[in-house]
């Protein structure tokens, strides 16, 4: 179970041009979001109660789906996207259409396909659009590369279901 610390805060890092979640003096989670993507550049902004709850909700929803080592990082990316990132432009034309109906529950994982496929975390929805955080890098239909952690907005008919291998072996 993830435990939050009241000292955690959001900080924009000029050196890296990235938003980070500062966990301690020596540990932080760097997001994929640069200054041009942010609505504000926070300076030592403590996690508010809503953000802390979202962080816990995302981590809990992904437990057993992602390795424990990735839970906090992915949850922080999602909360940062919802709290600080400008609304992305719809990019459905850069992804393949999916004829398979996919569940679009928030905090669930699906796939997007361009020239390559990538798993995404659904973070916001306004029918027929959905905002997703990429969980792995991918190449779009136009050849452009997107890195893990980026926020994309697509029509729901671009999402594909994802099949997960169990993270834990069954024992007799």
Report the location of each language-model feature.
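Short beta-strand-centered aromatic/proline hotspots
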Residues: 116-133, 137
């Amino acid at each position: 179970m993830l435990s939050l610390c009241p000292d955690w805060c959001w900080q924009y890092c000029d050196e890296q041009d990235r938003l980070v979640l500062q966990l301690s003096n020596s540990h932080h989670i760097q997001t994929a979001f640069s200054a041009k993507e942010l609505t504000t550049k926070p300076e030592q902004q403590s996690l508010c109660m809503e953000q802390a709850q979202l962080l816990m909700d995302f981590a809990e929803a992904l437990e057993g789906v992602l390795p424990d080592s990735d839970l906090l990082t992915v949850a922080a990316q999602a909360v940062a996207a919802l709290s600080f990132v400008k609304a992305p432009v719809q990019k459905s034309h850069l992804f393949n259409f999916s004829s398979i109906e996919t569940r679009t529950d928030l905090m669930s994982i699906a796939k997007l396909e361009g020239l390559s496929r990538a798993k995404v975390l659904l973070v916001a929805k306004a029918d027929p659009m959905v905002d997703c955080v990429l969980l792995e890098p991918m190449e779009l239909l136009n050849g452009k590369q997107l890195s893990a952690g980026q926020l994309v907005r697509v029509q729901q008919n671009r999402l594909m279901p994802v099949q997960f291998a169990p993270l834990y072996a069954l024992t007799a």
